[in-house]
Amino acid sequence: MQYKTFLLPASGSEQTEENLNVFLRTHRIVSVRTEFVAGETLAWCVFVEFV
């Protein structure tokens, strides 16, 4: 298995969202886990497991 993480700002980032969508469309995804991160900046952390 391989892993990749994405950090999506809660305020939105079209480029980051597009990067995530392209990655998901072009890889064999095993699982996706999301967690909301409330630190200095608010964001969604997306953890992708793929083959």
Where are these regions (language model features)?
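A short, charged, amphipathic alpha-helix used as a generic interaction element across diverse proteins
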Residues: S13-E35
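Sequence-level motif detector for i,i+2 pairs with an aromatic at +2
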Residues: M1-Y3, H27, A43
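C-terminal edge-of-domain segments
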Residues: E40-V51
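A short, exposed loop/beta-hairpin motif centered on an aromatic-Gly-Thr core
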Residues: M1-E14
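Hydrophobic beta-strand residues in large extracellular and virion-surface proteins
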Residues: F6, I29-V32, V46-V48
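Intrinsic disorder/low-complexity segments enriched in polar/small residues
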Residues: Y3-T5, E18-N19, F50
